[in-house]
């Protein structure tokens, strides 16, 4: 499968989205998936995939009460505990990274058994990190130490 990370920082005509479109323009996919979140759906459409299969398992980590807040603005006492154990503890009462990786692994298991061999996936950094763990590229503890650029194309083979 090909996991394509999205960013809407510069809009769809910006360099990141255009780079993704260019990077996959010569690829042939037998199936296309997207996170249902709008920035991934918009990027998929910009790249010519107007009806990707939307799958909730491709969503970014659920940060619970911390969702859409700046880190500097958080005063939640759980934040310090989460920093110390971000793999196992739920972020803001939402989801733990370990649970996110489980749902991504379930998606990838289903994809591997689907018969599709060339998939394009429009998703988020955390999902890509979980996919790297699944593919054996790195242990879960190191999954965010590998650089994944905004707008990059990431190819994973299983």
Which residue stretches match the model-derived regions?
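Amphipathic, non-transmembrane alpha-helical scaffold segments
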Residues: 14, 37, 97, 101-105
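Phosphate-handling substructures
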Residues: 47-103
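Catalytic metal-binding/acid-base residues of hydrolase active sites
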Residues: 38, 58, 126
């Amino acid at each position: 499968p090909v996991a394509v990370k999205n960013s809407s920082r510069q809009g769809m005509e910006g360099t990141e989205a255009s780079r993704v479109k260019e990077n996959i323009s010569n690829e042939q996919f037998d199936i296309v998936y997207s996170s249902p979140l709008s920035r991934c759906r918009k990027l998929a459409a910009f790249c010519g995939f107007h009806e990707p299969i939307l799958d909730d398992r491709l969503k970014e980590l659920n940060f619970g009460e911390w969702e859409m807040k700046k880190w500097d603005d958080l005063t939640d006492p759980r934040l310090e505990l989460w920093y110390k154990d971000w793999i196992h503890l739920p972020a803001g009462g939402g989801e733990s990274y370990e649970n996110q990786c489980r749902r991504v692994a379930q998606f990838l298991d289903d994809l591997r058994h689907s018969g599709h061999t060339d998939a394009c996936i429009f998703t988020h950094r955390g999902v890509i990190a979980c996919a790297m763990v699944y593919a054996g590229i790195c242990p879960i503890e190191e999954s965010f130490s590998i650089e994944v650029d905004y707008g990059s194309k990431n190819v994973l083979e299983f």
